[in-house]
C-alpha cells in the first residue's frame, strides 16, 4: 500500500487504482459486493464467518478493525468457534428467502476455514448446497 493511501481511502475509493494486500482485498471484496448490489437497485447485506485458526487467520482481525465501516454497509462478521459452526451460521443466512417478510433483498454469505475444517464441515456445506439460496 502506498504511504499516501490509508485503509479508509482504500476501502472507500470506488474508482481508479488502489493497492492493498490479500487480507485487505478480502475485506474490500465484501464492500464491493454490497456496493455492486446497491447499483443494481438491491438492498443486500453480507454475513461473514470463519475460524480464527484458518490460513487466513488475520482476516478476522481485519474485519473487526473495519467493523464500523462494514456495519454501515450491512456487513456483519461473526467469529466462528470452529469451521463447522461458522459454516452452519453462514448457511442460516441463506435461508432468509424461506421465511416471511425480509429486511433485505438478499444476503451474501462468506465462509473461510482450513482444509481439515472443510472435512469437518461437510454436512453443513452439503446441506447448504442442496437447499440452495434466494434469488439475490
Where are these regions (language model features)?
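Thiamine diphosphate
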Residues: 1-136
